[in-house]
């Protein structure tokens, strides 16, 4: 669907994470959506990033002056960041974020659940922006949260930070084959009780204990 012409684009697109898109939209819709955007490799994006990308294209091409969205706060994480980087991390910096709050409290209108969101405003060209980080939150009543933020001015990077661009860091060759990140559990479902582990291992050596730094104090 073609968007109507506008100088400014403002929105609060649906909060559907990548893993929940099929549940909320259905397999057919998700497959058709990803096929239509195939050249941008969007399979790991949250639903809201399709809006962000399209608005960024309009601003880059001079068809809109500026856009601002409320999005999931995972916008600055690795998979969603791939949507931002073609606009922000290239030599020409075709689009710049001029205002951002990376992590802000929010109440989901669908079920009243407390969630975290991000806010971004972008315009064409290489421009510095204002980054506001939340440093204090206070619940006033069932529907309101008082929030205090501190501003920083500078070039806002795709990870919604200002300063050294750690996204350009490369792996240390000296660590190759001698350093490992180790095991990371993908969710609470991977944790089992000692009793269940013993019953599993009665048949085969399938479950092993995992320790991290917190267990070695």
Named regions from a protein language model:
Residues 2-205:
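Signature of N6-adenine DNA methyltransferases within the class I
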């Amino acid at each position: 669907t073609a968007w109507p012409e506008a100088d400014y684009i403002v929105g609060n697109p649906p909060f559907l994470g990548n893993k929940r898109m099929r549940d909320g939209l259905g397999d057919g819709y998700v497959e058709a959506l990803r096929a239509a955007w195939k050249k941008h490799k969007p399979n790991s994006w949250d639903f809201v990033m399709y809006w962000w990308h399209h608005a960024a294209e309009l601003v880059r091409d001079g068809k809109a002056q500026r856009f601002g969205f409320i999005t999931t706060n995972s916008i600055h994480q690795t998979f969603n960041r791939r949507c931002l980087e073609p606009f922000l991390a290239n030599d020409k910096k075709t689009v710049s974020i001029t205002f951002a709050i990376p992590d802000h409290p929010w109440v989901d209108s669908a079920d009243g659940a407390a969630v975290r969101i991000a806010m971004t405003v972008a315009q064409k060209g290489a421009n510095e922006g204002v980054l506001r980080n939340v440093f204090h939150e206070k619940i006033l009543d069932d529907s309101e949260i008082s929030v205090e933020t501190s501003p920083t001015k500078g070039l806002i990077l795709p990870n919604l930070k200002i300063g050294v661009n750690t996204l350009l860091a490369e792996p240390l060759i000296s660590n190759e084959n001698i350093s490992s990140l180790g095991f990371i559990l993908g969710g609470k479902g991977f944790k089992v009780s000692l009793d269940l582990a013993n019953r599993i291992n009665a048949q085969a050596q399938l479950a092993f204990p995992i320790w991290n730094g917190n267990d070695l104090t």
